Amino acid sequence: MFTDTINKCAANAARIARLSANNPLGFWVSSAMAGAYVGLGIILIFTLGNLLDPSVRPLVMGATFGIALTLVIIAGSELFTGHTMFLTLGVKAGTISHGQMWAILPQTWLGNLVGSVFVALLYSWGGGSLLPVDTSIVHSVALAKTTAPATVLFFKGALCNWLVCLAIWMAIRTEGTAKFLAIWWCLLAFIASGYEHSVANMTLFALSWFGHHSDAYTLAGIGHNLLWVTLGNTLSGVVFMGLGYWYATPKSERPAPAKINQPEAAANN
């Protein structure tokens, strides 16, 4: 039932591990690209949201954020939140080791951070119409996120990456227009529901930091948010999606590591 999708995810995990080991610069550049792509989506939705009545703002922002994951998937790049699912399935299928997984994840996160801050800098240098005004929702949302309780951030992070990984999972299982609809619906649900995505928050926080933010907005608050949201994102990617679909697949249908390790299987992803 899920064997083919697990095969593709595990083969992608092997590809990620090879890229990280054999071409570290390429891996970091690709990770930075993912952070930048998500950042472009954040700039888009906050530009639109700043103009809208609060009653319709979540729907419009959610309906337009699909560009972020579409760029990550279709253009190709290395996104931390998606890696939590891919690498977990790679470990279970035997295409990578636990050590490789936990070495790659922080590198991906840091690469995403570099790209997120870079695109925020470009926006700031380009005039950044959202940044000079202290009433901009960039600043109010960033402050609210950095002062939220840890438990709220953790569980919103878990719910968020459940949807993001579902979007990626469904994109793997579908073709054509259905692929884009899967991404669109899941990201609409994530943004409109107010969930927390560590990489999306990176750009938002950088945007606010480079602008006219409140004195209550601090680096400690940013670190607080990113810590708990990252942990929540990791929980859902590893447990809900990676382990969830592995154990939802009958043992007799789970892929054999020897089969997945064939070079042609990795090349097909």
Curated annotation (Swiss-Prot):
Spans traversing the lipid bilayer: 30-46, 59-75, 108-125, 154-172, 180-195, 231-250
Record keyword Oxidoreductase present: no
UniProt keyword terms in alphabetical order: Cell inner membrane, Cell membrane, Membrane, Nitrate assimilation, Transmembrane, Transmembrane helix, Transport
Side of membrane Cytoplasmic, spans: 1-29, 76-107, 173-179, 251-269
Gene Ontology biological process terms from the UniProt entry: formate transport; nitrate assimilation
Membrane topology: Multi-pass membrane protein
Stretches of the chain found on the membrane's Extracellular side: 47-58, 126-153, 196-230
Compartment(s) where it occurs, according to its Swiss-Prot or TrEMBL record: Cell inner membrane
Any GO molecular function: formate transmembrane transporter activity
One Pfam family from the record: Form_Nir_trans
CC per GO annotation: plasma membrane
Function: Catalyzes nitrite uptake and nitrite export across the cytoplasmic membrane.
Family as reported in the entry's similarity comment: Belongs to the FNT transporter (TC 1.A.16) family.
Protein's recorded name: Nitrite transporter NirC
Encoding gene, per UniProt annotation: nirC
